[in-house]
């Protein structure tokens, strides 16, 4: 596989995982929303 493709896939996965992760962290830090 091409290294650029692997890098783009990794970035995409990190971005998709960062969305729900930020929501969970904010809700956990702020308590009940």
Swiss-Prot record:
Membrane topology: Single-pass membrane protein
TM region(s), chain numbering: 5-25
Record keyword Chloroplast present: yes
InterPro entries named among the record's database cross-references: PSII_Ycf12_core-subunit
One term under GO cellular component: photosystem II
One record GO biological process: photosynthesis
Protein origin, superkingdom: Eukaryota
Intracellular or extracellular location(s): Plastid, Chloroplast thylakoid membrane
Keywords tagged on the record: Chloroplast, Membrane, Photosynthesis, Photosystem II, Plastid, Thylakoid, Transmembrane, Transmembrane helix
Recorded family membership: Belongs to the Psb30/Ycf12 family.
Biological role: A core subunit of photosystem II (PSII), probably helps stabilize the reaction center.
Self-association state and partner proteins as the record states: PSII is composed of 1 copy each of membrane proteins PsbA, PsbB, PsbC, PsbD, PsbE, PsbF, PsbH, PsbI, PsbJ, PsbK, PsbL, PsbM, PsbT, PsbX, PsbY, PsbZ, Psb30/Ycf12, peripheral proteins of the oxygen-evolving complex and a large number of cofactors. It forms dimeric complexes.
NCBIfam families per the UniProt record, alphabetical: PRK13686.1
Protein name: Photosystem II reaction center protein Psb30
Organism: Tetradesmus obliquus (Green alga)
Gene name as annotated: psb30
């Amino acid at each position: 596989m091409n290294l650029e493709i692997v890098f783009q896939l990794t970035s995409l996965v990190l971005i998709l995982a960062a969305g729900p992760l930020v929501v969970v962290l904010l809700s956990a830090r702020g308590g009940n929303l």
